[in-house]
Amino acid sequence: MKPSERRKARRLAVQAIYSWQLSGNNIADVEHEFLTEQSLDGVDVAYFRELFSGVATKKTQLDELIIPHLERPIDEVSPVEKAIVRLATYELTFRKDVPYKVAINEAIELAKAFGADESHKFVNGLLDKLVARK
C-alpha cells in the first residue's frame, strides 16, 4: 500500500469528520456523501471508512483522552483542529500498526493544509503530550 493512499484517506477523513461535526448529520449519510461526491483517485477507501467511522463512533472516548491535555475547553478548539486531533488520537490509540511519529507528522501536515496559521503548532504540542502520557 502506497503511503500516499493513506495520506489521501486521512485528508478525506478529516474533511468528513469536520463536515459531520458541523452538520450533526448521520454518520452513514456523511460517509456516503464523501464517497459519492469526492474524487477517490488514489485514496485508500477502506482506511478512509475506518478513520471516519472510528472517530465518529468513538468521539467520547477520544475526547476523554484529549481533554486533559487542553488548556481550554474542547468547545473552544476550532472544528478543523478538533477533527485533526481526533483523527490522530484515533490512529495513536487504535492503529498500533501506524508508528506514532507517522500519526503526528500526518496530523501536522493536515493542520498546515486545513488549519489556521498556528494550528500545526497546537496539534503538534497536544499530540506530543498525549504520546508522552501513554
From Swiss-Prot:
GO terms for molecular function: RNA binding. Coiled coil: none annotated. CDD domains: Terminator_NusB (cd00619). One of its GO terms (cellular component) is cytosol. It comes from the Bacteria. Keywords: RNA-binding, Transcription, Transcription antitermination, Transcription regulation. GO terms for biological process: DNA-templated transcription termination; transcription antitermination. It holds the Pfam family NusB. InterPro entries: NusB-like_sf (IPR035926), NusB_fam (IPR011605), NusB_RsmB_TIM44 (IPR006027). Involved in transcription antitermination. Required for transcription of ribosomal RNA (rRNA) genes. Binds specifically to the boxA antiterminator sequence of the ribosomal RNA (rrn) operons. Belongs to the NusB family. This is Transcription antitermination protein NusB.
